[in-house]
Amino acid sequence: MDQVKIEINEETHIKNFNITLFDTAGQERYRAITKNYFKDSHGIILIYDITSKSSFGHIEKWLESIKETLSDWKKSGYMIMILGNKLDLVENNGKKRAVTSEEGKNICSKNDIYWGGECSAKTFEVNQIKEIIETFLKKVYIKKVLIYKLYLNIIMQNKNNV
């Protein structure tokens, strides 16, 4: 588990985000541990290996686990992003792709979650990964702000109707 601090300058307002990163390496034994962290977070990025059908299959299991733990995840503004990894193996090393981009997009569409695209953690194109994470964090932040404003609006309307 690593903690990373990221700042995003959005229209001159700097927002600080603390990110906790878990690399479970597809190990099912970590599922029980991470459930506790779902409750205290605002979003999660699920990453699979595009050269492994098995890795992609675990995404559905993680989604089920998130939905069981956070039954109201959509209403609460909880964001989920799916990201394909190991693009370098397909592009540079001639390894066969086991999961198409379309399959990644389809699982996102089916579950109403955000598709982050595909990348390579090995070649770590810093700008690409930074951009993916920043986009995700902006979506988390905007969704939380919109829900908060909606909540305040409802309170004010109820107050005025009394």
Feature locations, PLM:
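TRAFAC-class small GTPase G-domain
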Residues: M1-Y148
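Cationic, amphipathic, low-complexity alpha-helical segments enriched
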Residues: V145-M156, V162
